Amino acid sequence: LKTLNETNQVYIIDIRAAADFTLGHIKNAHNVLLKDILTHIAGVDLTNYTKVAVVCYTGQTAGYATSLLRLMGYQKAFALKWGMSSWNAVFATSWNNAIAAGNAYSTQFVATPTEKAVAGKLPVLSTGFTSGQDILEARVAELLTAGFDPAKVTSAAVFAGLSNYYIVNYWPAAQYTDPGHIPGAIQYTPKESVKLAVDLKTLPTDKPIAVYCYTGQTSAALVAYLRLLGYDAKSVLFGTNGMIYDIMVGKSMTTFKEAEIMGYEYE
């Protein structure tokens, strides 16, 4: 991102609160509210930019927003991995706090598999529209207006009520077994399982779905897609970095660490 920015090849949208943006941001970044991101990008000539970078605090809200932008056809949209936490240590508080408490559930993961539910029906959408494009636009607008809050859940809330959620482990099958998973979680293979022709319809339409990955960034992007379709899906914040951090480090899985913080200048 730094290199692209120095050569004017990237358009940066920072969706953090205005007060935090004022305290420090990447040079050339535009501060835009999440609910306004689609309206904003529609008014920008992106011809000369190779990428659009969406920036938040941790990479999670940006993952959610980027997923919706891509569903709307903006294939140049990318989320800044780890958010501003990766840019400079000044902005890394959220991630540092998450991993500081990141071993809270290290003794509670299990290897026992839970089978997927039997395939059922897709959610019913009521937008008042009939064409695919109109329905898509209405759903994306609704999700952006609602913001990221309804689309996220803490690991503490999930562990406090395991039976309240259909828990999706969005990992490769081998890792579902080792290092294991949240009790009752069901393995869905990234980029494959949630396709309509594969296992999408095994997801429930009458129960909240808690999706977790390593960091909360991929799950946020997936949850945007699932919520668009009408599922009550929620991304588990900080993923397993906030649950079994040391175990992940030991197995060389994706973790936030000091080496991820670049120490770049900001304005």
Language-model features, listed with the residues they occupy:
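An N-terminus-focused feature that recognizes amino-terminal "leader" regions
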Residues: 1-26, 31
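A short, well-structured juxtamembrane/interface segment
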Residues: 1-4, 144-160
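Flexible, charged surface loops at secondary-structure boundaries
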Residues: 3-7, 45-48, 158-164, 202-205
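Short hydrophobic beta-strand that contains or immediately precedes a catalytic carboxylate
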Residues: 11-16, 29-32, 165-169, 185-188
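Single-residue recognition of alpha-helix capping/boundary positions
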Residues: 17, 172-175
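Rhodanese-like catalytic fold shared by cysteine-dependent sulfurtransferases
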Residues: 22-51, 63-151, 174-208, 217-267
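Short, surface-exposed ligand- or partner-binding patches at beta-edge/loop junctions that are enriched
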Residues: 55, 212
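Aromatic/histidine-rich interaction motifs
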Residues: 59
